[in-house]
UniProtKB/Swiss-Prot annotation:
Superkingdom of the source species: Bacteria
Subunit structure: Part of the 50S ribosomal subunit. Contacts protein L32.
GO biological process: translation
Gene name per UniProt: rplQ
Name of the protein in question: Large ribosomal subunit protein bL17
GO CC terms: cytosolic large ribosomal subunit
Organism: Staphylococcus epidermidis (strain ATCC 35984 / DSM 28319 / BCRC 17069 / CCUG 31568 / BM 3577 / RP62A)
Length: 122
């Protein structure tokens, strides 16, 4: 299966996709370019599938990709992006077989005219 190079070396591309995937798990909605959104969609779909499995091996595989970001909840407790993935998000999509993300076109970006989109969890 092919992939987009996104004008970066493989290390830079991997780091960017990790950052975007973590941001999408934490915020559940991000704005980025269309090419980046299509690439990060693949990463996030696989992460959510791992979250639904819920076993130790899946947790370790997801931890390889997600950044160790702390999230402050409404009740002043904190959780990591990994905990949110395996708790809240895995529960929400337990009955859904794929298709966890949605891409909405926003229009061209002001600075360079790149096609902007919003990618969000369904």
């Amino acid at each position: 299966m092919g992939y987009r190079k996104l004008g970066r070396t493989s290390d830079q591309r991997k780091a960017m996709l990790r950052d975007l995937a973590t941001s999408l798990i934490v915020s559940e909605r991000i704005e980025t370019t269309e090419a980046r959104a299509k690439e990060v969609r693949s990463v996030v779909e696989k992460l959510i599938t791992l979250g639904k499995k819920g076993d130790l091996a899946s947790r370790r595989n997801a931890a390889k990709t997600l950044r160790n970001v702390e999230i402050l909840n409404e009740d002043d407790s904190t959780q990591t992006a990994l905990q949110k993935l395996f708790g809240e998000i895995a529960e929400r999509y337990s009955e859904r077989q794929g298709g966890y993300t949605r891409i909405l076109k926003v229009g061209p970006r002001r600075g360079d005219g790149a096609e902007s989109v919003i990618i969000e969890l369904v």
